[in-house]
From Swiss-Prot:
It comes from Arabidopsis thaliana. The keyword Repeat does not apply. Gene3D superfamilies: Phosphatidic acid phosphatase type 2/haloperoxidase. The lineage of its organism: Eukaryota, Viridiplantae, Streptophyta, Embryophyta, Tracheophyta. One of its GO terms (molecular function) is hydrolase activity. Its main location: membrane. It is found in: Membrane. This is Probable lipid phosphate phosphatase beta. It is an enzyme of class 3 (hydrolase). Its EC number is 3.1.3.-.
Amino acid sequence: MSPSTTTIFIGPILAVDAAVSHAIHTAAKPFLPPFVLLLLEISADFRFSFPVSLSFLLSPPLRSFLVPFLLGLLFDLIFVGIVKLIFRRARPAYNHPSMSAAVSADHYSFPSGHASRVFFVAASVHFFSAAAEASMTGPSYSFLDGWIRDHNDGDVKVEVVVVVWIWATVTAISRILLGRHYVLDVAAGAFLGIVEALFALRFLRFDEMIFGR
């Protein structure tokens, strides 16, 4: 497909996406709680989420989840960066870097790295909970285990899964409200995050190799 043909098909879609995204941002701007939205931005930043997740390795029963999870976070960072370099879609013109709590590592908009990351986290927790790994049915080793585990069946507590999904959804929407991304950027990022979670939990399970039994 030639560049001109691509423009004919993609151009109108991007134009509608930009118009809808700007309308949402403009309508919501007077009511936005900047402090809360910036906290959401920080919570989903890789430089915050990765070290925090890394510290959870102190809980042995969680390692079967955390090893593919941490590798998945790294994969997400690299893969989304490559996709951004391929598409090179500029961020919205009304995006104000001065309002950002996190220093942006790039100037490209598609897909949203924050959206992919938070949906990767939410999907990973959800899928791991549904799988009910055998290693999670053992005795609790720390306060952390008791906080997130349901000792009736060893699974991750439903409340934790629900809270993580709510956090992911609100954070993803905040990217549009803050003017960081367009709607399609966030939708694509969310989709990639879920696919990456499936990939990580299936193909990046090296916990036995790293920690042994």
